[in-house]
């Protein structure tokens, strides 16, 4: 995934960060629609893995955006992300292959 600063500057999505001390340790990107909320991306710096940051960002989103359902997509090989989403109440709804040969999974939370 390659995105430029210009892409972020014109993006209409919402971004929330998680700071640990003075370091931006994680960030979540949300696209909020009138009928659902889409988790566009969730990234945690590797140094901060396994510290609950992704879970805290997801919990914040659930409290801040009350419009359900929520949905998220990731690669089927991204087992840590899939496990996190399932722990947070998401269930798998479909899998498909992208034009780039990547197998993806979509999970929803009602």
Where are these regions (language model features)?
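Conserved beta-strand in the GNAT
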Residues: 17, 23-31, 36-43
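Conserved N-terminal glycine/acidic-rich loop preference
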Residues: 18, 37, 80-92
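A conserved beta-turn-beta hairpin within the catalytic core of GNAT-like acetyltransferases
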Residues: 31-40, 49, 68, 99-101
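Active-site rim helix/loop that mediates acceptor-substrate recognition in acyltransferases
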Residues: 1-15, 19
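C-terminal "cap" of GNAT-fold acetyltransferases
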Residues: 71-79, 87-88, 94-110
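Alpha-helix C-terminal capping segments
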Residues: 8-11, 30, 57-68
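Residue-level recognition of the GNAT/N-acetyltransferase active site
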Residues: 40, 45, 49, 73-75
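Conserved acetyl-CoA-binding loop-helix of GNAT-fold acetyltransferases
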Residues: 44, 50-63, 83-87
């Amino acid at each position: 995934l390659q995105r430029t600063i210009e892409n972020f500057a014109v993006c209409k999505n919402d971004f929330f960060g998680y700071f640990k001390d003075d370091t931006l340790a994680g960030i979540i990107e949300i696209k909020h629609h009138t009928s659902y909320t889409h988790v566009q991306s969730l990234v945690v710096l590797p140094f901060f893995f396994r510290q609950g940051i992704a879970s805290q960002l997801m919990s914040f989103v659930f409290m801040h955006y009350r419009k359900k359902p929520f949905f998220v997509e990731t690669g089927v090989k991204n087992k840590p992300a899939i496990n996190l989403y399932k722990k947070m109440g998401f269930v798998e709804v479909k899998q498909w292959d992208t034009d780039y040969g990547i197998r993806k999974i979509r999970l929803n939370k009602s």
